[in-house]
Amino acid sequence: MKYGYFDDERKEYVINNPETPSPWINYFGTGDFYSLFSNTGGGYCFYKDALLRRITRYRYNNIPEDMNGRYFYVRDIAEDGETSVWSPGWKPLMTKLDSYECRHGLGYSTISSSKNDVNAESLFFVPTEHNCEVHKVKLTNNSKVKKNLQLYSYVEFCLWNALDDMTNFQRNLNIGEVEVDNGTIYHLTEYRERRNHYSFYSMNREPSGFDTDRNTFIGQSRGIDNPECIEKGISGNSKAHGWYPCASHRLDIELEPGQSETVIFVLGYIENDDEQKWLSDGSLNKKSAKAMISALSTDEQVDEAMADLAAYWEDKLSHYSVKTDNEKLDRMVNIWNQYQCMVTYTMSRSASYYESGIGRGIGFRDTNQDLLGIMHMEPAKTRQRLIDVASIQLPHGGAFHQYQPLTKRGNDAIGGDFNDDPLWLIMAVGAYIRETGDFALLDEKVPFAGTDGHPLSDGKETIMADHLKKAFHYINENRGPHGLPLIGRADWNDCLNLNCFSKDPDESFQTVVNVDSGTAESVLIAAMLVYSGRELADLGRASEGKTNALAGEAEYAIKAVDEMSNIICENAWDGEWFLRAYDANSNKVGSSENAEGSIFIESQGFCGMAAVGADKQYNLKALDSVEKHLAHQYGIDILAPAFTSYDYSKGEITSYPPGYKENGGIFCHNNPWVIIAEAVAGRGDKAFDYYKRIAPAFIEDISDLHRTEPYVYAQMIAGSASQTPGQAKNSWLTGTAAWNFVAISQWILGIRTSYEGLIIDPCLPSDLRHLEVERTFRGVKYQITIENPEGKNKGEAMLVPFAEGTEPCKVVYTIK
């Protein structure tokens, strides 16, 4: 069953039923102000950091679900006094509408609805040049009689720190402050004290009434689905003093038949320097707020801001596009996959409908992978993020696992000592320099972090190349009894905790003190070392003559790669597939000898990507085992058989019910590793088959089962051992987005970067006979035509050397 459809021409997903299986959301924001917006108007906004600068309040785990956001109420008063009340976005009133349509576009959403011959068209977006949301509401009278209407707005303010806001009520119920000035409601909580920021909600009409106190607006023992002010058609003109600050405007409107009225609301954020917080008379400095409101007060100004937003996304998506005879493939590559990559890069894993914005910031591992999906669109932002993330690396080569975006200070709030972390930096930096030719990054001054998360102040000057060397040496030189890298707290699979041994339900697997076994080893990290070691060696050789920052590192890396490849084949080959690990007692994990968890996807995928054991056809055998034991119609399970009881020697992975999350779920993030491995092996039909099993556009028809948005990837789909196979959770913020874009754009379609130019090396399904790719590379537009007349999977790779120029470079490649 579907709940909408793709409008590829407008780059929108159109939802025609408000009761989607879960809230289907969109993201707004291109700079520092960001918003989450559901198909019924739910969600919230924040400035830079969803934990520390939350602007509007949102209640996770609420009943009904998704029941706070930016809401509007229409009160329709008939001549006989009868009234009907409805919400243009369906929620919060949930009155049955005569029509409803939500369109999620690139950085904006619209909701069109009607009730009793009144049509409401609402536009929501964050402009590229302002720290605010714009809400434009147009009401039209389609009846033959005059309509007397009341339009109410409603948002609820968060008291900035989202965690404190939901826990510290003994204080917070006393500190809320607001000010109302000419229809603009200012939220000033703590501005008199330590804060230099405030928010506001304005309307470009003189309001008929307002409220800033939630209790006054809603009434006693009621909710936002039945506010007392809406029922009575009044406003309390209330001023919040503590309790629950909110912002509601009321506008009384008369519409003749055929007449329309448009109202513009701005929900904004302002920071003032300390010396400019107050005017000379001691009043709030509203200069910046009034300038923002003035810049967005007319239809023409809003239209211009929307045009700027459209141009922004048009530019981003112009850097890579494909044209084939498969419209689902084209829409994934050209629109939705790249859009999700940008959102995931921006949010990391901090703020979604599954991540509360409280527990996680910008992850070291996460962001290095996310950059793989956006660096062709955003090289400058990629460069800065690489510097930021390298700055939370520790001097020994390990790293803090995350940092908060507002402070950029490393922290162990969700654990540390994940020994895969350092190697992702090598992959991301190498990919960035291949993309841009910016070898100067290697000499960029980047400090290491001290144990407090702040930049180390030991007087030593370090550069980016030092971080890459430390990362590689740290992993290569910390090995276990079988010569494989030590796993630490965990590797990419956070829940494979081989040194944890936790029996206390009140402990976190991610933060509990681990046993320093010195024996638990990761085959995944070993394969990553081979893969990233080749990247480091290539980078070292390519940088010769440009910088001495990596002098001698290529030789070290290649020696380590050759040694580790041999060790994997000798000590981690199980006969039909690669082991996953050795535990703290040197027992095999992911072996045919194990009754449960006998095969894992990660080591098969990454060993295949790195072509470990290819001379012995180990990669092909491992991939065949994936197909036999892990693959099914909804994707590839992370492991099989699923664990049925808790095993404290393996940790959190065994605490999940069978078939969910890391215990046998389809962890979509590593499905593309297998897709790439199949492409490396030249098996294009199988690579594309796996791609289609989890790509949202290809599974839209099972939206009632899948539940999450049919236009973006989810982190997890319930696996074959679960009670609900095919049901997804945790959409939007997942490394799945970047890795699937890498898999399809670089390995199936086969357009990859090198230090010398572009490599054209497609591995196609046999029924894809012709395609055209436009790829911007170092400022040059490449127009690449790929012909596959005989329906083959793969041909010989071709290098197109880079040459600067202003004219498009046209290339024709034929698979022979």
Per-range role (PLM):
Residues 152-154, 169, 400-402, 528-653, ...:
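Catalytic cores of carbohydrate-active enzymes
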Residues 1-366, 380, 385-388, 392, ...:
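Anionic coordination/interaction segments
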Residues 802-816:
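C-terminal beta-strand-rich structural cap/linker in extracellular carbohydrate-active enzymes
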Residues 140-147, 272-276, 435-448, 535-557, ...:
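Inter-helical turn/loop segments and adjacent helix faces that build the functional surface
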Residues 258, 362, 366-367, 371-382, ...:
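Aromatic-rich carbohydrate-recognition surfaces in CAZymes
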Residues 352-366, 410-420, 510-526, 587-612, ...:
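Solvent-exposed loop and edge beta-strand segments that line ligand/cofactor-binding
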Residues 96, 321-335, 384, 389-390, ...:
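Active-site acid/base region of carbohydrate-active enzymes
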Residues 636-663, 764-788:
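Generic long, charged, amphipathic alpha-helical segments
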